[in-house]
Amino acid sequence: MLVFYGFLSSRSISHLKVYLVGGAVRDQLLGLPVKEKDWVVVGATPEEMTARGFKPVGKEFPVFLHPETHEEYALARTERKVAKGYKGFTFYAAPDVSLEEDLKRRDLTINAIAETPEGQLIDPYGGQEDLKNKVLRHVSVAFQEDPVRVLRLARLATKFPDFSIHPDTLELMKKMVCAGEIDALVPERVWQELNRALGNEKPTRFFTVLNQCGALAILFPEIKMEGKGMAALQSVTDKTPSPLIRFATLQSDLPPEIIQKLAGRYRVPNEYADLAILVARFGSDYVNLNRMDETSLLNFLLKTDALRRQERFDQFIFTCDLISSTTSSQPKKIKEIIKAVKSVDIKPLQEKQLKGEAFAKALEKLRLEAIRTLIS
């Protein structure tokens, strides 16, 4: 028994044919921690599941949440392609669908292994052998019917960087791209897979795989495999696990307006887009801090909003330092300057009842004096 953890005694699943499937079985076989568990139920109806206390959550096919563990239990199903895109499917879920039929619709053989309550592995498509040989291989030609599988495989390749892609699988991916299936991907799903890939062991491989099948030029025409941003991402991978920092690093060589377009196209969270644009726009200025006089330094702080958004600015200087890959006194220096500027006493200005432009000019003068004193 691998990861059933004693839930067999639960009244909710007693006498049901329940199997652990997918990534949980795969990761356990690889000796990796299991973060999520997915279950398949064979021979049951939706009515039987709800009668046992399961909460239906699936809109397109029967998926239920366990009343105690809140893990997902899906009825065994088959699927048939009826239109382009990842939503172009009809599903059949009924008591007569076998476990083997359910496993056959899955993307990769290493994700098509099931485990019985007794710990027996059911592996009709050779997933264990592919795990042993470190191969990412499709279960059936139905792989080419769902464009999301291109993204998922690319993302999985970042998690398992020493796994190769089976030549036949790569050929299917190329056919999908040529058939225009990639064009049907929705922005949210592209971003979801990219963000997860950025947090994995080798994020650059996400783009390598997309490039190999021809999808990179369609999904991310701004990103070049030979670009400085890709090289920077490769160099910082072992220094930070943060998808946020890695995203900004990847685009550090792009014009800010191009980053904005990419972020808008895939509905990238503002936190990611803002940092990436900040690094692209002001990264070179940060590297040259030592050459700036007090006026340039103050302008730099104001343009980067360093005085108001300290956390984002800290992320900015951290990213810039990683990209430059040199140890310097820049972070300490700029933080001292920020502290000095923030410490400026404005009470005398208030006592003089200065307002508007007069107040702004007087405040600027005090800030410049504070910086000048520090750097002279």
From Swiss-Prot:
Please name the GO terms that the record assigns under molecular function: ATP binding; CCA tRNA nucleotidyltransferase activity; magnesium ion binding; tRNA binding
Protein name, UniProt field: CCA-adding enzyme
* Residues that hold Mg(2+) according to the record: E36, D38
Give the note: A single active site specifically recognizes both ATP and CTP and is responsible for their addition.
Q: What class of enzyme is it?
A: transferase
Q: List positions binding CTP.
A: G23, R26, R106, R152, R155
Q: What PANTHER family does the entry give?
A: MULTIFUNCTIONAL CCA PROTEIN
In terms of InterPro entries, this protein maps to:
CCA_bact, NT_sf, PolA_pol_head_dom, PolyA_RNA-bd, tRNA_CCA-adding_enzyme
Q: Which family does it belong to?
A: Belongs to the tRNA nucleotidyltransferase/poly(A) polymerase family. Bacterial CCA-adding enzyme type 2 subfamily.
Which residues are ATP-binding? Answer: G23, R26, R106, R152, R155
Q: Which residues cross the membrane?
A: none
